[in-house]
Amino acid sequence: MKLFITGVNGFIGTHLLENILAKTDWEVDGFDIASTNLAPFEGESRFAFRKGDIFKDNEILEAEVIKADAVIPLAGIAKPAYYIKKPVWTFELDFEQNLKMVRLCAKHGKRIIFPSTSEVYGMSGDTELKEDESPLTTGPIVKMRWIYSCSKQMMDRMIMAYGQEQNLQYTLFRPFNWVGPRLDTLKDAEERQARSVTQMLYDIVYRRKISLVNGGEQRRSFTWIGDGIEGLMAIIENKNKKADGEIFNIGNPANNHSVKELAELLIDEAKKFPKFREAAEATELDIIPASAYYGKSYDDKQNRLPSIKKMESRLGWQPKTGMREMLYKTIAWYAENEAK
């Protein structure tokens, strides 16, 4: 099998590439605007990288789609800070540029495996979020945070529409707070542009207070990147075509914790590392309103708990990694690679 992956330099892209090269005989053509995380893959005979801009390099993108058996468009914005500060760019990249990829796959009869997001469920009132049943409800227009959710939801609908009208072969997957090495850089965290785990770890390492937006009572289902990638691999493999035309949540309901609990667990795990112990023991939690941290256009969902029955029944996938193990392994990577 030959895959074309955009955004291959990113968090999911690098972990997926690593897994493919280690466990399969598949070939990968990768495309991204940067290659900062790809040094370990230099010289791999089954991996070819093309540096480029998804906004501009249309001929390259089409040529790569034509060569591929399946396309995985991972290029996109997935950081809440950007939804607020750069909403137009968020829409242009997450919807407009990725719609271009969908249309190329439909035009050339290629399978697309597309990253939706748990954010599409928005403010859904369902306790357990189900792919084909839960309503997708977002907040008012003045809450700019929802532009990402709406962009992704519209993309899901367009992909399904192309499947209906032009027989596009597709699968959508919805990651629920995947965590692990390379989630963000500590430089991102220094600029307050990182996601929760990396931001908190930065605050611990550099002896800053951990900010708990609105008290950190929001609950999320945190998922080890390795477990998430195993689920994604099952989708790509697509045994007996059981993934065709389906949407799958990929998350870990057993790791459903509040953001405050996440901070407390991260501090506890950081204490196990001699280089971080003193800083972790001194770390304080600081409760601040969302408006002070993100601005007035922020909004949030109080709990996000996935149903993974579909992944279990159709593809035989279940997450394996508990919360403490996941955080320990994540801290260990940053201790070795970034927090020198």
Indicate residue ranges for each PLM-predicted region.
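Rossmann-fold cofactor-recognition segment
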Residues: 45-56
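A conserved pocket-lining segment of Rossmann-fold NAD(P)-dependent short-chain dehydrogenase/reductase
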Residues: 83, 136-143, 176-188, 196-223, ...
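Active-site "gating" loop of Rossmann-like NAD(P)-dependent oxidoreductase/epimerase domains
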Residues: 77-89, 96, 110, 115-148, ...
